Amino acid sequence: MASENGDKLELAFSAVPDPKPKKDWVILSLRVVAFFATASATLVMAFNKQTKGMVVATIGTNPVTITLTAMFQHTPAFIFFVIVNAIASFYNLLVIGVEILGPQYDYKGLRLGLIAILDVMTMALAATGDGAATFMAELGRNGNSHARWDKICDKFEAYCNRGGVALVASFVGLILLLVVTVMSITKLLKLNRI
């Protein structure tokens, strides 16, 4: 009718919010990759074991051998590493479920605030586990001549290589946790901006 009279058409937009909030697929996909990285770091280190027979002495012409086993349980830093990465994996899996199912149960943005706080705590925990394990890995690879600690990676190469793979996977997970943490805090700040 307005076009027949020569008047301009006016379009009105509804200020009613969308009843279904959009899922943030970037954060969700980063969480999935972080879950796989921390879970693989946990499993690789948890099953990291190498047994090797070594000659320690020779009596006459008979060698005296011993069997040594390198396991992650022998080092408290590696035990902490496995526990921390398992916690980070479980947390990421839990938050993936909350991100998929949780928006319908959100109460005044409490879910996003709680996730942001727990993201920071999980990232800090993962960083401490990675730092402790990296220190012990460096000590195992190079030793410490001042403290007279011998290196072991020349004797247990496969053990050290698998430990290195676990560390790399864990650091990838840590970097992804850092990115997810920054994104979740930014998302929280955008929602609270008036």
UniProtKB/Swiss-Prot annotation:
Principal location class: membrane
Subunit structure: Homodimer and heterodimers.
The protein, known as: CASP-like protein 1B1
The organism of origin for this protein: Glycine max (Soybean)
Cytoplasmic side: 1-24, 99-111, 186-194
Record's bilayer topology term: Multi-pass membrane protein
Record InterPro entries: CASP/CASPL, CASP_dom, CASPL
Keywords: Cell membrane, Membrane, Transmembrane, Transmembrane helix
UniProt KW Cell membrane keyword: yes
Cellular compartment(s): Cell membrane
Transmembrane stretches, start-end: 25-45, 78-98, 112-132, 165-185
Signal peptide: none
Family: Belongs to the Casparian strip membrane proteins (CASP) family.
Entry annotated with the keyword ATP-binding: no
Top-level taxon of origin: Eukaryota
